[in-house]
């Protein structure tokens, strides 16, 4: 009788482990398209991601690079001062989007051009997204001031 209870308990524990592992795998599989990794322009230039990968890029909009094309198409270059990546975006830019200002874009790298599906701009004079701050610090060009909130 004791051996049967022990065997049954082991079976239940094994079944619970398999169910937990299966549900974790299903959740991970379902979330794979919702995860966008952040890259700096230097990282994109050094190791370009595959064209099918959606990721986020952030940095400063290079001064003098903003060109408004036909309709809602806009091209510009994003830089972290070490590398520059051309960006193409079709849509309405945020009101605070400007040259020499911080931005984060979501999209794909196609033929060396980042085709953005979404563009976000910093929301005031002192804010900069945490990922952009980290990338600029890594390049040694970010200078933090006391009144500059991050992230």
Swiss-Prot record:
GO cellular component, one term: plasma membrane
UniProtKB keywords: Cell inner membrane, Cell membrane, Cytochrome c-type biogenesis, Heme, Iron, Membrane, Metal-binding, Signal-anchor, Transmembrane, Transmembrane helix
UniProt topology in membrane: Single-pass type II membrane protein
Protein family according to the UniProt entry: Belongs to the CcmE/CycJ family.
Localization terms from the record: Cell inner membrane
Pfam families, per database record: CcmE (PF03100)
Any one GO molecular-function label of the UniProt entry: metal ion binding
BP terms from Gene Ontology: cytochrome complex assembly
UniProt KW Nucleus keyword: no
Its biological purpose: Heme chaperone required for the biogenesis of c-type cytochromes. Transiently binds heme delivered by CcmC and transfers the heme to apo-cytochromes in a process facilitated by CcmF and CcmH.
Binding residues for heme: 123, 127
Protein name, per record: Cytochrome c-type biogenesis protein CcmE
UniProt cross-references to InterPro entries, sorted A to Z: CcmE, CcmE-like_sf, NA-bd_OB-fold
Keyword flag rRNA-binding: no
Membrane-spanning intervals of the chain: 10-30
């Amino acid at each position: 009788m004791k051996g049967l209870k022990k065997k049954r308990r082991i079976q239940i524990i094994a079944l619970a482990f398999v169910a937990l592992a299966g549900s974790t795998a299903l959740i991970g599989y379902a979330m794979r398209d919702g995860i966008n990794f952040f890259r700096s322009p230097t990282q994109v230039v050094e190791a370009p991601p595959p064209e099918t990968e959606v990721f986020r890029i952030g940095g400063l909009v290079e001064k003098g690079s903003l060109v408004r094309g036909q309709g809602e198409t806009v091209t510009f270059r994003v830089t972290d001062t070490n590398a520059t990546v051309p960006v193409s975006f079709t849509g309405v830019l945020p009101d605070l989007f400007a040259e020499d200002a911080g931005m984060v874009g979501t999209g794909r790298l196609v033929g060396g051009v980042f085709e953005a599906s979404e563009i976000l701009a910093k929301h005031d004079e002192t804010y900069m997204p945490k990922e952009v701050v980290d990338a600029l610090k890594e390049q040694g060009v970010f200078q933090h001031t006391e009144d500059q909130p991050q992230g």
